[in-house]
Amino acid sequence: MKKIMLVFITLILISLPIAQQTEAKDASAFNKENSISSMAPPASPPASPKTPIEKKHADEIDKYIQGLDYNKNNVLVYHGDAVTNVPPRKGYKDGNEYIVVEKKKKSINQNNADIQVVNAISSLTYPGALVKANSELVENQPDVLPVKRDSLTLSIDLPGMTNQDNKIVVKNATKSNVNNAVNTLVERWNEKYAQAYPNVSAKIDYDDEMAYSESQLIAKFGTAFKAVNNSLNVNFGAISEGKMQEEVISFKQIYYNVNVNEPTRPSRFFGKAVTKEQLQALGVNAENPPAYISSVAYGRQVYLKLSTNSHSTKVKAAFDAAVSGKSVSGDVELTNIIKNSSFKAVIYGGSAKDEVQIIDGNLGDLRDILKKGATFNRETPGVPIAYTTNFLKDNELAVIKNNSEYIETTSKAYTDGKINIDHSGGYVAQFNISWDEINYDPEGNEIVQHKNWSENNKSKLAHFTSSIYLPGNARNINVYAKECTGLAWEWWRTVIDDRNLPLVKNRNISIWGTTLYPKYSNSVDNPIE
């Protein structure tokens, strides 16, 4: 028996330095008063023993939260603008163009599980945070519950992390402890795995929307857009007048996600001393059900505003080409749009400096902005850029339902044109050239004015040339010419009778030949699309 005891004590003494060495190594990686366990944690932290009164409090919390009666589809809703009147169509002259502006009522309905993060609220955003699912969350100002917390398990999705190195247990899930735990996970990867994975490509999340109203863009990108637009400064006034086209792009480069293990019961997220009455006093009820931040994406967030004063219907295609880097060398119109457009970028993260970058430039430089921060390393640290929330009652995903009506404004430019007359025939000729000019009354109805050339039906001898300048709102152009044959039975003979011609930049009408064999041509230089 004594021999057995000696063997047992010897084994304990041998193993003790090893345990101390392991403990010291973990403490050097992170030392926060044992708030975080750096050992490889289980899938979820084990529940610590509770006293009878603590178990009673936990059961009451579970019963209360699980008994909250609410429709998860109606809790988080953003209602934007309601459009009742659509402004009428209008037209106006602008230099050598006639601009037609049209308005249409549109609506957008967007379900957003990811909530964007901007610097103003990043301090409130951390994995496992307990929040109220209410209008404050919809407005991206989460109302964090100030209660004692129990432990939780975090995991990170950086590549190569084995033996549960990608997990960590936070014993007291306060904001500072959780953020320190995230830093510990990232540093663990940098020290042990970064060399094997030197170029971790960011996961790309891309979304875009042509801009028409702030309410529309909030419905598209979430209420974080309000803060972003303080820097982007989308020109809604010029867009509404049809003088500008702008697109907003959200470009996320996600380096890694930190996830929280789902609690097996609501009370597992609270400290032992927390009671149902405390939660009720903090306003937790069916109108403000509790939720938790279940996942946070860390990386680089780029918001872009692309701008042009072009009225072309190909602006969206040009913007898409500029962002993707697609060559447009074979398309003159797209090339000109890109050449004469600009961008503004608001960038969060991806820099060792903890600051927001604002960059202005031409579309030709846009790809360089997007290529930066394409991979994760120490020099391109990630910041919180988006988070998701789950209801604490049942771990169901909390989705924000955004909707808004807005006025879509489109404009089209009609460039002024010209008809060039050239008469070189051996006869007397008379022309009759007419067209309609289109305008709009205050209700948006078309007003058609018929116009005639001042030299209509006047005899012209060869060689006669003239140019007729037509405004951009000219339509239904008719060109007629006749020549005098000298024949008693056919004194006038038609040379050309072309009707309902479209407006073009240069239309060349030529007549020539003899009285008996007149000829003509109708050709176009630089047609207007």
Swiss-Prot record:
A motif (Conserved undecapeptide) lies at residues 483-493. Its main location: secreted. It is found in: Secreted; Host membrane; Host cell membrane. One of its GO terms (cellular component) is host cell plasma membrane. One of its GO terms (molecular function) is toxin activity. Residues 35-54 are annotated as: Disordered. Keywords: Cytolysis, Hemolysis, Host cell membrane, Host membrane, Lipid-binding, Membrane, Secreted, Signal, Toxin, Transmembrane, Transmembrane beta strand, Virulence. GO terms for biological process: killing of cells of another organism. Residues 1-24 form the signal peptide. SUPFAM superfamilies: Perfringolysin (SSF56978). The keyword Lyase does not apply. It holds the Pfam family Thiol_cytolysin. Belongs to the cholesterol-dependent cytolysin family. Homooligomeric pore complex of 35 to 50 subunits; when inserted in the host membrane. A cholesterol-dependent toxin that causes cytolysis by forming pores in cholesterol containing host membranes. After binding to target membranes, the protein undergoes a major conformation change, leading to its insertion in the host membrane and formation of an oligomeric pore complex. Cholesterol is required for binding to host membranes, membrane insertion and pore formation; cholesterol binding is mediated by a Thr-Leu pair in the C-terminus. Acts as a major virulence factor required for the escape of bacteria from phagosomal vacuoles and entry into the host cytosol. This is Listeriolysin O. It comes from Listeria monocytogenes serotype 4a (strain HCC23).
